[in-house]
Amino acid sequence: MMTMLRGWITMIVMLTAINAQAACSWPAWEQFKKDYISQQGRVIDPGDARKITTSEGQSYAMFFALAANDRPAFAQLFNWTQNNLAQGSLREHLPAWLWGQKDPDTWSVLDSNSASDGDIWMAWSLLEAGRLWKETRYTEVGTALLKRIAREEVVNVPGLGSMLLPGKIGFAEANSWRFNPSYLPPQLAQYFSRFGAPWSTLRETNLRLLLETSPKGFSPDWVRYESKQGWQLKAEKTLISSYDAIRVYLWTGMMHDGDPQKARLLARFKPMATLTMKNGVPPEKVDVVSGNAQGTGPVGFSAALLPFLQNRGAQAVQRQRVADHFPGSDAYYNYVLTLFGQGWDQHRFRFTVKGELLPDWGQECVSSR
């Protein structure tokens, strides 16, 4: 009788644990998988008629899978990326940035150039997956990928030093370089500094990029640097802070409070917080030189600013907007911004002062809506 009773108790405890794990999963991530990720591990952007997949999307999804302790999804994403974007090996090749429907009968790489924002997040996620899950294979591939990024996407710029190019082709001329300030999150730059040159100095040059290109407190989507003339802020085409730059504020907000760069960046970008508080919504576009804003940013912008805003009342306004207008199944970019911003806001993950992932795999249930 006692043996049978113990058996029932054990079964009840196990079922309770399983139900608790299911109930306390990350609902927004589970919905993202249903709406955007194929059974093979391909993140699909339905907003493009070619049903495209980008290295950025694959890398972000790998991060979310790691934060959610979703090892099967991570493995699927990794395998699909390696087999379809990296010619079978992320040790040997940077992933192509764009894949999709080439013609009615052909699905393949559409642009073989790389995109360093995806490469950076992918290398970091692999290294952290190796550490947290004790998976040597991920550590080895992440290390090899990071070395390849340093060889193929990092350049020495006179007057600046080591800088991360947006991709291996098309961003460097004889005396001119084009950069995207959102491509290297400061906490990831801090993490990579443990690997020595060029990462040990890239963190400081990346800070210069962020601070020196935001004269009015708004980071540009893209900016050019010339060897003898510096940053080209008054370019022939107006520099805009918009869909790329929103990630600069997101990364800044998610930095560890003990990181000395965070206070400097929050101070520099305070005008973005002030403008959002004044209008109740983030702007869609801001002229980097004049500070003039226009349009209303989509709901993903509100989610991205949840870690960045330091005023609790301002956070509450954007939090409510996200809850009221949660991205659907046809808004890839808004959804990934929401997974980052809202996920952080719900304490599903944090970054340590060294840039490592601090997941909350055992947290209480938190609603995503």
Curated annotation (Swiss-Prot):
One Pfam family it belongs to: Glyco_hydro_8
Catalytic activity: Endohydrolysis of (1->4)-beta-D-glucosidic linkages in cellulose, lichenin and cereal beta-D-glucans
GO cellular component assignments: extracellular region
Top-rank taxon: Bacteria
GO biological process entries: cellulose catabolic process
UniProt signal peptide: 1-22
Official protein name in the record: Endoglucanase
Native source organism of the sequence: Salmonella typhi
